[in-house]
UniProtKB/Swiss-Prot annotation:
Transmembrane segments: none annotated. It comes from Colwellia psychrerythraea (strain 34H / ATCC BAA-681). One of its GO terms (biological process) is methylation. It is found in: Cytoplasm. S-adenosyl-L-methionine binds at T146, G167, D189, N230. The keyword Transmembrane helix does not apply. GO terms for molecular function: protein-lysine N-methyltransferase activity. CDD domains: AdoMet_MTases (cd02440). This is Ribosomal protein L11 methyltransferase. Keywords: Cytoplasm, Methyltransferase, S-adenosyl-L-methionine, Transferase.
Length: 293
């Protein structure tokens, strides 16, 4: 069945309202995407969500839907119909699931580590292979911040080490650490769905017996040999006293989800507790590394 996609330009103040409007008009699905390649929105405790400052809200309609009527309705309720920016696109009829799956390939990080979708053949059976499908939560290796952290983990000797994955998302960093030899990983995330995804992915990779998962309110007191936090600069700044408490004596720390212009502030903050190294850069994103003093 062919489809019509309606794209609306929005911002963090009106994105959710636009979503409601599209649903009211009969959209079969509503999707938010980032309009300017900024980080994925950061969920907050509770139900509050911060959207990107430049967001595209996309509604998917059956081709037979009266789109003139939809546009007229949206313009009638828009506070400034002259400023309502939209685009209509006809999507060809194809196997969208197959199209989506074809976009994901095994990816190598560092010298040993591969992340492989379950429907692809493993390129190197002797390598460290994490089987992970794009799904419930952010973090499947395709974003530079995740790639930076995976490459860092690959370069460490994690044999019998303990690791904290702060903001674990899909669990990709936890799984990588466990597959690379860590004896125990504690994953922490504010999103229960992320914890569900991490557990499911750990079970698929046969490492769930060494993974503990917690919401922040339940997180234990714990000192780790290695701490990795791939979130965003704001939470990394605000939660610095919490994150640093997980880093044991001479423990290693990696921070990502940070743009180049945000790095110096975080270097200064975490430099109170750690000997910080020069940042690693991929595209416009950085990873900060340090060792507890």
């Amino acid at each position: 069945m062919p489809w019509i996609q309606l794209r609306l330009s929005a911002n963090e103040d009106n994105a959710e309202k636009y979503s409601d409007w599209l649903s009211a008009c009969g959209s079969q699905a509503v999707t938010f995407i980032d309009a300017k390649d900024t980080p994925i929105y950061e969920p907050l405790p509770g139900d509050e969500v911060i959207y990107w400052s430049n967001t595209v809200v996309m509604g998917l309609f059956e081709a037979s839907h009266d789109m003139d009527k939809v546009i007229s309705y949206l313009q009638s309720i828009h506070p400034d119909k002259e400023q309502m920016r939209y685009k209509l696109e006809q999507l060809e009829d194809k196997d969208w699931e197959r199209e989506w799956m074809d976009n994901f390939h095994p990816m190598k990080f560092g010298e040993r580590l591969w992340v492989c979708p379950s429907w692809r053949d493993v390129p190197d059976p002797e390598a460290v292979n994490v089987m992970l499908d794009p799904g419930l939560a952010f973090g499947t290796g395709t974003h530079p911040t995740t790639a930076l952290c995976l490459t860092w983990l690959d370069g460490l000797d994690l044999q019998d080490k303990t690791v904290v994955d702060f903001g674990c998302g899909s669990g990709i960093l936890s799984l990588a650490a466990l597959k690379l030899g860590a004896k125990k990983v504690i994953g922490i995330d504010i999103d229960p769905q992320a914890l569900q995804a991490s557990l499911a992915n750990a079970e698929r990779n046969n490492v769930s017996d060494r993974l503990e998962l917690y919401l922040p309110k339940d997180q234990p007191e714990f000192k780790a040999d290695v701490v990795v936090a791939n979130i965003l600069a704001g939470p990394l700044r605000e939660l610095a006293p919490v994150i640093i408490e997980y880093v044991g004596d001479k423990g290693l720390l990696a921070l990502s989800g940070v743009l180049e212009e945000q790095a110096q502030t975080l270097q200064t903050i975490y430099g109170q507790w750690c000997d910080m190294e020069p940042v690693s850069v991929q595209e416009e994103w950085v990873r900060l590394n340090g060792q507890r003093k």
